[in-house]
UniProtKB/Swiss-Prot annotation:
Name of the protein described by the UniProt record: Probable cytosol aminopeptidase
EC nos: 3.4.11.1, 3.4.11.10
Organism classification: Bacteria, Pseudomonadati, Pseudomonadota, Gammaproteobacteria, Pseudomonadales
GO cellular component, one term: cytoplasm
Catalytic reaction annotation: Release of an N-terminal amino acid, Xaa-|-Yaa-, in which Xaa is preferably Leu, but may be other amino acids including Pro although not Arg or Lys, and Yaa may be Pro. Amino acid amides and methyl esters are also readily hydrolyzed, but rates on arylamides are exceedingly low; Release of an N-terminal amino acid, preferentially leucine, but not glutamic or aspartic acids
PROSITE patterns with a match to the protein in the record: CYTOSOL_AP
Name of the gene encoding the protein in the UniProt record: pepA
Length: 497
C-alpha cells in the first residue's frame, strides 16, 4: 500500500472512497461540514435518519452523493469531543481499513484532521500511529499456503493534511513506513518454520542485507570461532544440535567514524526444546519464536537502513538451536564464559541468558554508547506483565528512561523492573561463580541480574519480550514485530530525526 500526503479540499478530491469523521450525536467537524455543503446536505440528511450515532469506530458507507467527485463516502464515528486515546485511535483506523479492504476501490482519501488524539500532536504524532496501523494491517504470511490470499484492490491511500502540517505528516509517514517494513521483516523471520530458519539461514539473511547496503558490514562467527573466543556458555547451548551456532555481526556506519556506536544484541534461539531439561510437548511448536529478539534487531536495522539515520549501530545476533542429544549440555555442567566467570548450568532450558552473556562480553570491543539486549527470555515476564507490555531492566537510569519514553511515543510500551542487589544472591552456586537460574521467585528479575554481571563495562538495558513478541494460538497466531517500533523510536531520538 502506498501512502501519500496532500493538502487539498476534501470536497474536491476524486477518489473511490472519501473517509470522513462524525462525532457523537452526529456532529460534523469543519472538514466534514464543507463536504456536506458540497453534497447539498446529503450527509447531514442521512445522519438525521439516525443510521450512525458517531460512536468510535462505527462506519456507514454512502454511495454516489451529489456534488462530489468521490464515488463513495465512508463515515466513521469519532466519539465525543474529547481527544481519543492511542488505543481508540488505532481501533478507529483499523475499522476504516477493514471496510476499505472489503471494497473494490483501488484508492481512498482519509480526511481525519478533525479528530484529536490525546498526548499526540495534530500532525506527526497522530498520523504516525495512523500510518503504522494501516501498514501493519496489510501484513499477510501465506508463504507455505498452496492457495495464496487474493491481492487486495486497495493500492493507494491519501492522507489530507492542512498546509501548515503537511511536512510533519510526510515525516510521520516516512518513519511509519520504515518501521512497518522492519516489523514485517521481523514477523516473516519469526513465522518461518524452524526446519528452514536455523542459525545458518539467519547468517545468510545478514549477508544478503550486507550486499544490498554499502554502509553495512557483515561478519559471521562460526562454532569454531565461538569456541576459540572462549564463549563457553554460548557454545554449550548449541552443542546438542546438528545445526551449529552462529554469532552474526552487522555493523552500520551512518554517523561519523569517531562516533561511538549503539549496540543491539538479539537472542536468536531458532528452536528451543529446552534441551535435556525438556519442555512439555503442548505448544512446543511456538518455540520457533524464541529467536524473535534477534528478528526484532534485524527489523530495527532494516528501518534504520531505510531511513539512513546518521548514527553508528552494531547489531549482534546470538543464534543457536537448543536440542537434546548425546552431545547436549547436561544439568550440572559448568562452563567458563568469555568474561572468565564460571556458570553452573542447573537448567538447560535457561539457555537464552547463556548465549547473551558471552555476546554482551563481546560487545565491549565496540566501546559502545549503550547496549540493549532483546530476548524472549522468561515465562515469568508473561506472568508479571501479560502480553501487552515488555519487561525492561538496566544499569543506567537515563538509558532506561529513554527507552520507556520511546515506548510511550511509539505506542510499544515497556515497564521497568528492579535489579536490586538482594536478587543477585539467588544466583549463588556452591560449585561455580553463579548458577544460570535463581529459583522460582522473581524469574524475570534474576535473569536480568544474571545478564547484568556481564554488562558492567557500559550503559546497558535488557528487554524481555517473552509476552509481546508473538500471539499464541488461534487465527491471529504469529509474530507481532515488537519491539521494532520502540527500538526505532529510541534510535530516531538519538539521531535527532
Amino acid at each position: 500500500m502506498e501512502l501519500v500526503v496532500k493538502s487539498v479540499a476534501a470536497a474536491s478530491v476524486k477518489t473511490a472512497t472519501l473517509v470522513l469523521p462524525v462525532g457523537e450525536n452526529r456532529k460534523l467537524g469543519a472538514v466534514a461540514k464543507a463536504v456536506d455543503q458540497a453534497s447539498e446536505g446529503a450527509i447531514s440528511a442521512v445522519l438525521k435518519r439516525g443510521d450512525l450515532a458517531g460512536k468510535p469506530g462505527q462506519t456507514l458507507l454512502l454511495q454516489n452523493l451529489p456534488g462530489l467527485k468521490a464515488e463513495r463516502v465512508l463515515l466513521v464515528g469519532s466519539g465525543k469531543e474529547e481527544a481519543l486515546g492511542d488505543r481508540a485511535w488505532r481501533k478507529l483506523v483499523a475499522s476504516v481499513a477493514g471496510v476499505l479492504k472489503g471494497l473494490n476501490g483501488t484508492d481512498a482519501v482519509l480526511a481525519l484532521d478533525d479528530i484529536a488524539v490525546s498526548n499526540r500532536d495534530a500532525h506527526y504524532g497522530k498520523y504516525r500511529l495512523l500510518a503504522e496501523t494501516l501498514l501493519d494491517g496489510e501484513y499477510v504470511f501465506d508463504r507455505f499456503k498452496s492457495q495464496k490470499a487474493e491481492p487486495r484492490a486497495l493500492k493507494k491511500v491519501t492522507l489530507l493534511a492542512d498546509k501548515a502540517g503537511q511536512a510533519e505528516v510526510e515525516r510521520a509517514v516516512k518513519h511509519a513506513s520504515a518501521i512497518a517494513s522492519g516489523m514485517a521483516f521481523t514477523r516473516d523471520l519469526g513465522n518461518l518454520p524452524p526446519n528452514l530458519c536455523h542459525p545458518s539461514f539467519l547468517a545468510e539473511q545478514a549477508k544478503e542485507l550486507g550486499k544490498a547496503h554499502k554502509a553495512l558490514k557483515v561478519e559471521v562467527l562460526d562454532e569454531k570461532k565461538i569456541k576459540d573466543l572462549g564463549m563457553g556458555a554460548f557454545y554449550a547451548v548449541g552443542q546438542g544440535s546438528d545445526q551449529p551456532p552462529r554469532l552474526i555481526m552487522l555493523n552500520y556506519q551512518g554517523g561519523k567514524k569517531a562516533d561511538k556506536p549503539f549496540v543491539l544484541v538479539g537472542k536468536g534461539i531458532t528452536f528451543d526444546t529446552g534441551g535435556i531439561s525438556l519442555k512439555p510437548g503442548a505448544g512446543m511448536d511456538e518455540m520457533k519464536y524464541d529467536m524473535c529478539g534477534a528478528a526484532s534487531v534485524f527489523g530495527t536495522l532494516r528501518a534504520v537502513l531505510e531511513l539512513q539515520l546518521p548514527i553508528n549501530l552494531v547489531c549482534l545476533l546470538a543464534c543457536a538451536e537448543n536440542m537434546p542429544s548425546g552431545g547436549a549440555t547436561r544439568p550440572g555442567d559448568i562452563v567458563t564464559t568469555m568474561s572468565g566467570q564460571t556458570v553452573e548450568i542447573l537448567n538447560t532450558d535457561a539457555e537464552g541468558r547463556l548465549v547473551l552473556c558471552d555476546t554482551l562480553t563481546y560487545a565491549e570491543r565496540f566501546k559502545p554508547q549503550a547496549v540493549i539486549d532483546i530476548a524472549t527470555l522468561t515465562g515469568a515476564c508473561i506472568v508479571a506483565l501479560g502480553s501487552h507490555t515488555s519487561g525492561l531492566m538496566g544499569n543506567n537510569d537515563d538509558l532506561v528512561g529513554q527507552l520507556l519514553d520511546a515506548g510511550k511515543r511509539a505506542d510499544d510500551r515497556a515497564w521497568q523492573l528492579p535489579l536490586f542487589d538482594e536478587y543477585q544472591e539467588q544466583l549463588d552456586s556452591p560449585f561455580a561463580d553463579m548458577g544460570n537460574i535463581g529459583g522460582p521467585k522473581a524469574g524475570t528479575i534474576t535473569a536480568g541480574c544474571f545478564l547484568s554481571r556481564f554488562a558492567k563495562a557500559y550503559n546497558w538495558a535488557h528487554m524481555d519480550i517473552a509476552g509481546t513478541a508473538w500471539v499464541s494460538g488461534g487465527k491471529d497466531k504469529g509474530a507481532t514485530g515488537r519491539p521494532v517500533p520502540l527500538l526505532t523510536q529510541y534510535l530516531l531520538d538519538r539521531a535527532g530525526a
